[in-house]
Amino acid sequence: MKNNVNRFGYVSIVGRPNVGKSTLLNRIIGEKIAITSDKPQTTRNRIQGIHNIANGQIVFIDTPGIHACHSRLNKGMVDAALAALRGVDLLLLVVDAGGAIDDRLVRDVLGGTGTPVMLVLNKVDLLADKRVLLERMAAWSQLYPFREILPISAGSGEGVDGLIETVCGYLPEGQPLFPDDILTDLPERFIVAEMIREKIFRLTRDEIPYSTAVTVESFTERPNGVVAISAAICLERPNQKGIIIGKKGEMLKKIGSQARHDIERLLGTRVFLELFVKIEENWSERTSKLREFGYE
């Protein structure tokens, strides 16, 4: 790549759930803009992160994991991921380096796309025998004409700088679209709601994380500089309310405390966070609610 040529482009990060797509985006951007957990299907929306390079700018798009659809919400998530295959300059297909060789993923997702695709083998730090990595790279290369196959660890950062440098070589010429101090085009209210939802994913189990949506009802800055936020945790069934609140309110307090810590880091100021719980029965199957919560 010629260093004196300005570059700008869109790069979509796609793959199955729980392969480290959001962790990779956060690592590239250098800040937490996409939530993560050890549960699949944590990401529900397309998340854009903006990375500036010496001679240009890259907009990376994190996407929901591609999975079987069991609800309107799931379908909307997969539709968002598949939409991210279009109108971009490059695709990064992220897979678990130690996982199965997923020929169906390649066939269903990449079949017919004319966009250049790089394969990103993530979590290589978890492979005890590096010879396995070479075997996996060879096996994947038989499935699709990937432009590059790049082993990385989004968690530790291993190989990520090299990935960014390689991506730059595939960008078209162009001028930056965003100011160089912008990390994402997402509104703060959206990121705040996501940070609360992340804590629910990390602290609760079974169906609770998947039955939860979060909406920020108010967001105001007080004269003393404290930001006061009121957010609703929306559940699908009345019997879930006691679980999210917990004994003597302990679970709700824990969610709020951990979320407030992240929100204060995001906003750079003290935060007063009020959480309350309400029931929106079967919201994941109701088109009106999916639109209200930003999932359609």
Curated annotation (Swiss-Prot):
The keyword Zinc-finger does not apply. Coiled coil: none annotated. SUPFAM superfamilies: P-loop containing nucleoside triphosphate hydrolases, Prokaryotic type KH domain (KH-domain type II). Residues 152-154 are annotated as: G5. Gene3D superfamilies: 3.30.300.20, P-loop containing nucleotide triphosphate hydrolases. Residues 204-281 form the KH type-2 domain. GO terms for biological process: ribosomal small subunit assembly. Keywords: Cell inner membrane, Cell membrane, Cytoplasm, GTP-binding, Membrane, Nucleotide-binding, Ribosome biogenesis, RNA-binding, rRNA-binding. GO terms for molecular function: GTP binding; GTPase activity; ribosomal small subunit binding; small ribosomal subunit rRNA binding. Residues 15-22 are annotated as: G1. One of its GO terms (cellular component) is cytosol. Monomer. Belongs to the TRAFAC class TrmE-Era-EngA-EngB-Septin-like GTPase superfamily. Era GTPase family. An essential GTPase that binds both GDP and GTP, with rapid nucleotide exchange. Plays a role in 16S rRNA processing and 30S ribosomal subunit biogenesis and possibly also in cell cycle regulation and energy metabolism. This is GTPase Era.
